[in-house]
């Protein structure tokens, strides 16, 4: 069996923090300095009640909506990568599996590997496919780093946002 990506999509929270917003909090920096240093102008930030699993769930729902040829009941494994899990048990992948209405026979696994997580997720998915364990893997990522960063941590606040 050949492993390949059928479709990709994303979900962004509504709240946007701009470089201008950050300069108001950290006046020792300029909009230009932030843009030149990190190449980012806007960061999407999750609402207080919005979780990493919520963002990933929205991305998955969007994927199924944008690609009707991909059927939910064809997914037999879900992988969810996050550094900012909502809770320890149950795993977020299981919660997402249930909310999407995926088959109960579908495998579900959370993993966390920082910035390299997506690449490792692709490798895990490929292994599941080539090993004959799964035929269709749904790989999701979701992060709400903003909930874990100190408000005065300008280095990380200029780089990280939230998304699924």
Regions found by a protein language model. Give the residues of each.
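Short glycine-rich or small-residue beta-strand-to-loop segments that form or flank ligand, phosphate
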Residues: 76-83
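Conserved beta-strand segments that form the floor/walls of ligand-binding pockets within enzyme
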Residues: 4, 79, 110
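Acyl-thioester C-C bond-transforming condensing/cleaving domain
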Residues: 66-72, 86-164
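Cofactor-binding loop segments of dinucleotide-utilizing enzymes, especially the Rossmann-like FAD-
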Residues: 8-10, 83, 142
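Conserved "HGTGT" condensation-loop signature of ketosynthase/thiolase-family condensing enzymes
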Residues: 1-76, 100
